[in-house]
Design a protein with these regions (language model features):
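Short, hydrophobic/aromatic-rich segments at coil-to-beta transitions
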Residues: 18-23, 83-85
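Beta-strand residues in well-ordered beta-sheet regions across diverse protein folds
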Residues: 23-25, 109
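Core beta-strand elements of the Rossmann-like FAD/NAD(P) dinucleotide-binding domain
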Residues: 28-39, 43
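Flavin (primarily FAD) binding-site architecture
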Residues: 42-59
Length: 169
């Protein structure tokens, strides 16, 4: 079983022989407490490193274990692309790009570029991101003529990847 606690901000994690202890603060009341658990799952996404246990057995905590990658998705009206369900494509650099039809729109993504700002600086969608995905669409659907005016929405997110020094995102 599990206990889910809403509005609780994790301020620390400790490991011990029987599992772990998580220090939390109630975001509404400001009350602090700790929670003991047989198993602690750190599912904090791009913030995962900030919640490593203080006695983490991985050695040097100053060396980043993760590399953040920015991923951008575009949304176009469904009628602009001949996609009934899903299509996997390749961009000019060989990366996979998908188009997924859902409801009245089609989602197109994703980019994979290095994000150096840290998780506290959420990435923005840039003109270069949009152009990259539109070029991928044009490679596979040249007759569709999808352009910047067809993008009705977009968003960027962060993916935590295992840090591999010297490897591009």
């Amino acid at each position: 079983g599990a206990v889910v606690c809403n509005y609780m901000r994790v301020t620390g994690v400790e490991q011990h022989a029987g599992g772990g202890r998580v220090a939390v603060v109630d975001a509404r009341s400001g009350d602090a407490c700790s929670v003991d658990a047989a198993c602690v799952v750190n599912a904090a996404g791009p913030w995962v490193e900030s919640l490593l246990p203080t006695d983490h057995a991985g050695g040097d905590r100053s060396a980043p274990r993760l590399h953040l990658s920015k991923g951008v998705h575009l949304v176009v009206e469904r009628g602009r692309l001949p996609v009934r369900n899903m299509v996997m494509m390749t961009a000019e650099d060989g990366r996979p790009v998908f188009a997924i039809a859902r409801g009245g729109v089609t989602y197109v993504g994703t980019t994979d570029t290095s994000h150096e700002g840290g998780p506290e600086h959420w990435p923005a969608v840039t003109a270069d991101d949009i152009a990259y995905l539109l070029r991928a669409l044009d490679r596979h659907f040249p007759d569709a003529g999808v352009n910047e005016r067809d993008v009705v929405a977009s968003w960027a997110g962060l993916r935590p990847l295992i840090n591999q020094p010297g490897k591009a995102a």
